[in-house]
C-alpha cells in the first residue's frame, strides 16, 4: 500500500490537479481545507464559503474524503499580528511567506500527521528532493509561476514531508488536465493579492486596524510638495496615488516614492523612473534561513530575488556581522523594499532567504 498523502485543498485549480495526480500515482489521497481568516463571513473578504464548496466538489469528483480545519487563531497570532506590526513601522511585509512557514507547512503539516498522513501535498509550483529528514527546494518547470520565493522560509524538515505534484508541469498543462477531467475548478481564476483583504481597498482595510498618521511629502531636495495619508500606505518605487501632479516649475515626468523617514514621518519622492534614488547597490538583511548547506561558505557569490517574479540577480553575501548580512549586487537594483524578503539561488536550487532590513545606496 502506497503512502497516505493529505492535500491542502484551496478550492483552486492547482490543488485540484495535485490531488488527481497523486491519486493517479497510487497514493492514498485525502483532502484538507484550511480556514485561516474569520472575518469573511459578513463582508467581501476572501470568499471562503465558495472555496470550500469548490474543494468539496473536486473531492467528490475524485472520490476522496475532505477534512476541514480552522487555523484562524494561529493565522492571527503568527501571521497577521506580524503583518500589522511591520506596517506600523512603515515597512512593507509579505504575509504569504509567513503563512507558508507558520500555517501551511507547520500547523497544517502537524494536523495532517495527526490524521495519519505520511506526507502533505500542496498546489505550489515548486520541486523538492528528500534526503532522510531533510528536504531541498528547487524551482518549478514553469518559471513564470515558480513559487519558491514564497517557500524559502519553510523548515527543511517540513520539506522532507512534502510533495509538490505540479512542479513538473506548466500552468496551461494544469488547466488542460482539469478541463479534460471536468473538474469544477478548471476555469477558476487564480487568486491574487493578499488573501484576507480580498476585493477590499487596501487603504480601507489597513485603516480598520492601524491609526494612520498623515505627514509631509517632500522632494529629495527638501521642498514640501503635499501631504501623505500615512507612511504605511506607500511602498518604495510606488507611482500611483501620490496626488502631487502638475506642480509649478516641475517637468511632466511622474513622481515616485524613493524613501520613507519614519522618525520625521516624511515621505520622499523624486521625478523620473530612472532617478538614482530609486536604485540601490545592495542591502542589509537579517539572519538567513538556510535551506542548503552554504552557511559555512561565506562570503558566497550566487543569485537573488528581492521580489516575486524578478529575474535572478547576481550578488555576493557577506559573512554575518551581529546576525546581519551585507548583500552587494553586480548591478544596481530598483526599489528594494525593507520588510520584504531577499531569496537566494544557485542555478535551480533555492538556498534560503532573509528579511530585508536596510538599503545600501
Curated annotation (Swiss-Prot):
Domain of life of the source: Bacteria
Descriptive protein name: tRNA-specific 2-thiouridylase MnmA
Region of interest (Interaction with target base in tRNA), residue spans: 94-96
Function: Catalyzes the 2-thiolation of uridine at the wobble position (U34) of tRNA, leading to the formation of s(2)U34.
Main location: cytoplasm
Coiled-coil residue spans: none
Gene3D superfamilies on file: Adenine nucleotide alpha hydrolases-like domains (2.30.30.280), HUPs (3.40.50.620), Translation factors (2.40.30.10)
A GO molecular function held by the record: tRNA-uridine 2-sulfurtransferase activity
Disulfide-linked positions: 99-195
Catalytic activity as recorded in UniProt: S-sulfanyl-L-cysteinyl-[protein] + uridine(34) in tRNA + AH2 + ATP = 2-thiouridine(34) in tRNA + L-cysteinyl-[protein] + A + AMP + diphosphate + H(+)
Keywords for this protein: ATP-binding, Cytoplasm, Disulfide bond, Nucleotide-binding, RNA-binding, Transferase, tRNA processing, tRNA-binding
Amino acid at each position: 500500500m502506497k503512502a497516505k498523502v493529505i492535500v491542502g485543498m484551496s478550492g483552486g485549480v492547482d490543488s485540484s490537479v495535485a490531488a488527481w495526480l497523486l491519486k493517479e500515482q497510487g497514493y492514498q489521497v485525502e483532502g484538507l481545507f484550511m480556514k485561516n481568516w474569520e472575518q469573511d463571513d459578513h463582508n467581501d473578504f476572501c470568499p471562503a464559503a465558495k472555496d470550500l464548496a469548490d474543494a468539496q466538489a473536486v473531492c467528490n469528483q475524485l472520490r476522496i474524503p475532505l477534512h476541514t480545519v480552522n487555523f484562524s487563531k494561529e493565522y492571527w497570532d503568527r501571521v497577521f499580528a506580524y503583518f500589522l506590526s511591520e506596517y506600523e513601522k512603515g515597512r512593507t511585509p509579505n504575509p504569504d511567506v509567513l503563512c507558508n512557514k507558520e500555517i501551511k507547512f507547520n500547523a497544517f503539516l502537524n494536523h495532517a500527521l495527526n490524521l495519519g498522513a505520511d506526507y502533505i501535498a500542496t498546489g505550489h509550483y515548486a520541486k523538492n528532493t528528500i534526503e532522510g529528514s531533510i528536504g531541498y527546494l528547487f524551482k518549478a518547470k514553469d518559471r513564470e509561476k515558480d513559487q519558491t520565493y514564497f517557500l524559502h522560509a519553510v523548515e527543511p524538515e517540513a520539506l522532507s514531508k512534502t510533495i509538490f505534484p505540479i512542479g513538473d508541469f506548466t500552468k496551461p498543462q494544469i488547466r488542460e488536465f482539469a478541463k479534460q477531467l471536468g473538474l469544477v475548478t478548471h476555469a477558476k481564476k487564480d487568486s491574487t493579492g493578499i488573501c484576507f483583504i480580498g476585493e477590499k481597498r487596501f487603504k480601507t482595510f489597513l485603516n480598520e486596524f492601524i491609526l494612520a498618521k498623515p505627514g509631509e511629502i517632500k522632494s529629495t531636495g527638501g521642498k514640501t510638495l503635499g501631504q501623505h495619508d500615512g507612511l504605511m500606505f506607500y511602498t518604495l518605487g510606488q507611482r500611483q496615488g501620490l496626488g502631487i501632479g502638475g506642480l509649478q516649475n516641475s517637468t511632466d515626468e511622474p513622481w515616485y516614492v524613493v524613501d520613507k523617514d519614519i522618525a520625521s514621518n516624511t515621505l520622499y519622492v523624486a521625478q523620473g523612473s530612472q532617478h538614482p534614488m530609486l536604485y540601490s547597490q545592495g542591502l542589509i538583511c537579517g539572519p538567513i534561513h538556510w535551506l542548503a548547506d552554504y552557511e559555512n561558505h561565506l562570503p558566497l557569490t550566487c543569485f537573488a530575488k528581492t521580489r516575486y517574479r524578478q529575474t535572478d540577480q547576481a550578488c555576493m553575501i557577506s559573512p554575518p556581522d551581529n546576525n546581519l548580512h551585507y548583500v552587494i549586487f553586480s548591478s544596481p537594483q530598483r526599489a528594494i523594499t525593507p520588510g520584504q524578503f531577499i531569496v537566494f539561488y544557485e542555478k535551480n536550487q533555492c538556498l534560503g532567504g532573509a528579511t530585508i532590513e536596510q538599503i545600501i545606496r
